[in-house]
């Protein structure tokens, strides 16, 4: 009888662990993994023209294989073009602050 209880307990424990492992949702990538700087001093020319989508967005897609691009504005003309490898939304492109 004791052996049967031990087998059932072991089976139950293994079954629960398998369920937990397969039901854990995938962890989404952090911004640091998604956003990479385009490179060079291209921020202001890529982000300043008031066109839609920005040159940053278009060039990141064409030249870097990213899903899109975002502009991060600092003080004055301090701008960075970041290629976004996780999100392809052209509507969320311009971020203020954070440089």
Swiss-Prot record:
It is found in: Secreted. Inhibits bovine beta-trypsin and alpha-chymotrypsin on a 1:1 molar basis. SUPFAM superfamilies: Scorpion toxin-like. Disulfide bonds join 34-86, 47-71, 56-81, 60-83. Keywords: Antimicrobial, Disulfide bond, Fungicide, Secreted, Signal. The keyword Signal applies. GO terms for molecular function: sodium channel inhibitor activity. This is Defensin-like protein 2. Its main location: secreted. Coiled coil: none annotated. Belongs to the DEFL family. Protease inhibitor I18 (RTI/MTI-2) subfamily. The keyword Protein biosynthesis does not apply. Residues 94-99 form a propeptide. It comes from the Eukaryota. It comes from Sinapis alba (White mustard). Residues 1-30 form the signal peptide. GO terms for biological process: defense response to fungus; killing of cells of another organism. GO terms for cellular component: extracellular region. Pfam families: Toxin_3 (PF00537). The record marks 50-51 as: Reactive bond.
């Amino acid at each position: 009888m004791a052996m049967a209880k031990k087998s059932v307990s072991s089976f139950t424990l293994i079954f629960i662990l398998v369920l937990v492992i397969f039901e854990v949702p995938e962890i989404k990538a952090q911004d640091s993994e998604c956003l990479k700087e385009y490179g060079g001093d291209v921020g202001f020319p890529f982000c300043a023209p008031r066109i839609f989508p920005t040159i940053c967005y278009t060039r990141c897609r064409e030249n870097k294989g990213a899903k899109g691009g975002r502009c991060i504005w600092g003080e004055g003309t301090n701008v960075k073009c970041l290629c976004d490898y996780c999100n392809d939304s052209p509507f969320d492109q311009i971020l203020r602050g954070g440089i």
